[in-house]
Amino acid sequence: MTQDELKRLVGQAAADYVIQNVPEGAVIGVGTGSTANCFIDALAVVKARYRGAVSSSVATTERLKSHGIKVFDLNEVDSLQVYVDGADEIDASGAMIKGGGGALTREKIVASVADTFVCIADASKRVPVLGAFPLPIEVVPMARTAIGRRVTALGGVPVLRVTKDGAPYITDNGNEIIDVKGLQIADPRGFEAQVNAWPGVVTVGLFAERGANLCLLGTENGVETIVYSAN
């Protein structure tokens, strides 16, 4: 199967999980990116079962609305039973690197209030150690260079994310993103806490403190379900 076929496979598997485990009338937390889009497309078929969704980005909001799925602001919702999102990398503990699509801060906020985080990914995203995929850090623009120096001191190579025109990429929150190459993150929780403590960091794209509870992993043999009992 191609990577796109695997994404559609796990998107459907996540919709099936929601149907089986989330009661009718609930609001669903939805992530951002190409794999999350496959989940949205599958969820649209059964949208009448649910009140709507909480979105993690402008792009996701647009896709949800295009399917006629009502979008709630997180402030309008008391709780979320489930949050479904992709990952750029996921390790054996359920810790992830996320933010390749630029929505890491809102993804982390929505994930933090959900009872269950369901990660959907193809098998190429499963890694023994996080860090081969560049680690995104959303930063307040004036702190970009100072944070870059801190990253360099830890052995990382900071690269400012830019658009096709060469201008700094701007997040939905009005900030910039530094992508850090060359890391091997042996202690994701510790590294997440360390980077988040730097002045000017909005959030780092490590999801270890709030890792996945469940991963639906697309493989050549079908969907593999992995449960992370420690999260």
Swiss-Prot record:
Pathway: Carbohydrate degradation; pentose phosphate pathway; D-ribose 5-phosphate from D-ribulose 5-phosphate (non-oxidative stage): step 1/1. Substrate binds at T32, G33, S34, T35, D85, G86, A87, D88, K98, G99, G100, G101, K125. GO terms for cellular component: cytosol. Keywords: Isomerase. InterPro entries: NagB/RpiA_transferase-like (IPR037171), Ribose5P_isomerase_typA_subgr (IPR020672), Ribose5P_isomerase_type_A (IPR004788). It comes from the Bacteria. It catalyses: aldehydo-D-ribose 5-phosphate = D-ribulose 5-phosphate. Signal peptide: none annotated. GO terms for molecular function: ribose-5-phosphate isomerase activity. One of its GO terms (biological process) is pentose-phosphate shunt, non-oxidative branch. The keyword Isomerase applies. SUPFAM superfamilies: D-ribose-5-phosphate isomerase (RpiA), lid domain, NagB/RpiA/CoA transferase-like. Disulfide bonds: none annotated. Gene3D superfamilies: 3.30.70.260, 3.40.50.1360. The active site is at E107. Its EC number is 5.3.1.6. NCBIfam families: PRK00702.1, rpiA. Homodimer. Belongs to the ribose 5-phosphate isomerase family. Catalyzes the reversible conversion of ribose-5-phosphate to ribulose 5-phosphate. This is Ribose-5-phosphate isomerase A. It comes from Burkholderia lata (strain ATCC 17760 / DSM 23089 / LMG 22485 / NCIMB 9086 / R18194 / 383). The gene is rpiA.
